[in-house]
Amino acid sequence: MEQAEFLEKTRNAYLEARECSFLPNSNVSVLSRGTSHSISSITEDLFGCYCAEKVAEPNGIKILIDPPISFKGTELKNKSGKRSLLLRPDIAFTKDNIVNCFFDIKTDLGYKRFEFLNQAKDRNKQLNTIKDKYAHYKDGKTKINQKVEISSDIKFIYIVISQGNIGREKMNEFISGIKLLENVDVFVISKGEHLNSYNDISKTEINKADFDRLDKLINEKLNG
């Protein structure tokens, strides 16, 4: 899958999300949605496919979509300190049962944009506590427990699909702050018109600099 195809499929997902999931056998014209469906799970699946096609040798590689990664049985706890730490990345890469990368896919920064940098700083600290630790997740189909180890070089990557909903100056401020963090990075993979725009989508462009850097990171983590 090429970069342009990824953005095109995301755009199509937005368009389909405006429609009803089911249509009646008659009187279709009376039915209309006032809000769109969420496409979060679709973008997770789509990015998983995008990455899977880049795997050179599949033996030992797993691309986990929305895995609940639990540290139950270790000293690691959640913020309240009452329960075992549980991570829910959108995507996780494992190579020979070692987790080397987490991804958080954001369609845009939306209303949470002012929390973004603080969230990234919290993630950076959290990754330092889980390096070289063991965890487990349950396979979504079989529910069989799978044991994994967190790499000493674990990374947490934010992928922002659309720059829309936030000004360029504020976006650059967030990105500059995140670039200072040891374990966290961010890639904004399109620019111009938001992919959910009701205007002409030709105004959306691939952000080649970031998308190419993202591709390089994916290749390093899956095939390095």
Annotate each PLM feature.
Residues 1-5, 143-144, 152-161, 211-224:
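Long, low-complexity, intrinsically disordered N-terminal extensions of eukaryotic proteins, enriched
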Residues 6-9, 13, 126-133, 213, ...:
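Charge-rich, solvent-exposed alpha-helical interaction surfaces
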Residues 84-104:
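Active-site beta-strand-loop-beta-strand hairpin of nuclease catalytic cores
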Residues 66-70, 103-108:
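Short loop/turn segments at strand-loop or loop-helix junctions that form parts
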Residues 105-189:
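Catalytic cores of nucleic-acid endonucleases
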Residues 1-75:
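Interdomain/boundary linker segments immediately adjacent to catalytic/signaling cores
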Residues 68-90:
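Charged, often glycine-rich, active-site loop that binds/positions anionic groups
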Residues 163-224:
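Non-catalytic C-terminal interaction segments of nucleic acid-processing enzymes
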